[in-house]
Design a protein with these regions (language model features):
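ATP/NTP phosphate-donor binding region
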Residues: 1-109
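A short, small-residue-rich loop immediately preceding and capping a beta-strand
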Residues: 94-132
């Protein structure tokens, strides 16, 4: 939880943020950052998957983290009900029940790899699903 003072009428603001990593090589720190989570749901769009999402999958696999990835298709991903619906529906993927790793169909962490639209959509989905 972060908390900060502000000059607005609310005076104090809070956000349920566990941490933030801004550094060179931040992708390589993902296993340490997500040490408390075992089922990672990675969400990216086509562009951000090519830029970093594929590497994130490799890092999670090397760290022994169970994960699955949703790549939102299309030239432009919009922050709308369709995008949110895809994220939430895939989080509950019934096919995951047959995963040989006994991956529960519900992840315990949503990892957004991407742009403002991907991040904002994942933030709302995680709120709706009560996931970090």
């Amino acid at each position: 939880m972060i908390e900060f003072e502000c000059s607005c009428d609310m005076k104090k603001h809070r956000a349920p943020l566990e941490g933030c990593e801004i550094s060179s090589g931040a992708l390589e720190k993902i296993p340490q950052i997500l040490a408390d989570y075992s089922k990672i749901y990675v969400v990216a769009d086509e562009n951000t998957y090519a830029a970093a999402g594929k590497r994130v999958e490799e890092i999670l696999k090397a760290a022994g983290k169970h994960h699955r990835t949703l790549v939102l298709d299309g030239e432009t991903v919009l922050p709308n009900v369709e995008t949110l619906g895809k994220i939430i529906l895939f989080a509950n993927d019934p096919l995951a029940k047959s995963n040989i790793f006994e991956y529960s169909p519900m992840p315990d962490f949503i990892l957004a790899v991407g742009s403002g639209t991907v991040n904002d959509s994942c933030r709302l989905a995680s709120y709706r699903l009560r996931l970090p």
